[in-house]
Amino acid sequence: LIIGVLALNINIKDVYGENIQSLRVDARNAIAIDRESKTILFEQNGYELVPMASTTKILTALITIERGNLDEKFVVSKNASSVRGSTVGYKENEEITVRELLYGLMYRSGNDAAITLAEGIGGSIEGFAEIMNNYKTSLGLLDSHFESPHGLDMTDHYSSAYDLALLTAKGMEYEEFREIVGTKEISQSKYNFTRDYSNINKILWKIPGANGVK
């Protein structure tokens, strides 16, 4: 199970020296790559196919940002408002901008935000999953398959640490993505949101130099 993706504004060799492969990582699956060159700096079961849980939302966010029109409003459906797991708490028939939904998605890991984006962009969860799989093919992600925008348990929904690292590196090319995943709090007034948001990603609060991601 992949549970986190970390981005750092540091040279990892400056911290651990040349003997980076001796680094101890408790996670079963881990990989470190250079964002620009994609050079693999450390790898531990990085190509194993495993469920990726809410790190799925990295791709949901990336597709949404590349689509553009972040000020468009989507209507929250009953399907979205009643989803299990982590949510923002959006109510059925609420109208939320795409930008705010992105913050709900990545700040709060909101499954309700994920479904609202998926339905607004793809027409349905199934339609959005098709977009996700077409997109991952265009990025050359060979070890991934997507069935949902949020990562709740599905039978054929998986990725690898390596694929998620490549996906994250792509996301970090976009200013909007970097802003969303790299900040701790945002007030309702900044973009005329419906509520304030605080980022639940503990990495941002506990690790100096961290700038995301999930």
Where do the protein language model's features map onto the residues?
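Short active-site loop at a secondary-structure junction
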Residues: 42-63, 73-75, 96-104
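Glycine/charged-rich beta-loop-alpha catalytic/anionic-binding loops adjacent to active sites
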Residues: 39-47, 95, 145-146, 207-208
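Penicillin-recognizing serine hydrolase domain
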Residues: 21-27, 98, 124-214
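Short, well-structured active-site flanking segments
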Residues: 66-79, 175-183
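Short glycine/serine- and small hydrophobic-enriched flexible loop segments
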Residues: 62-69, 119-122, 166-173
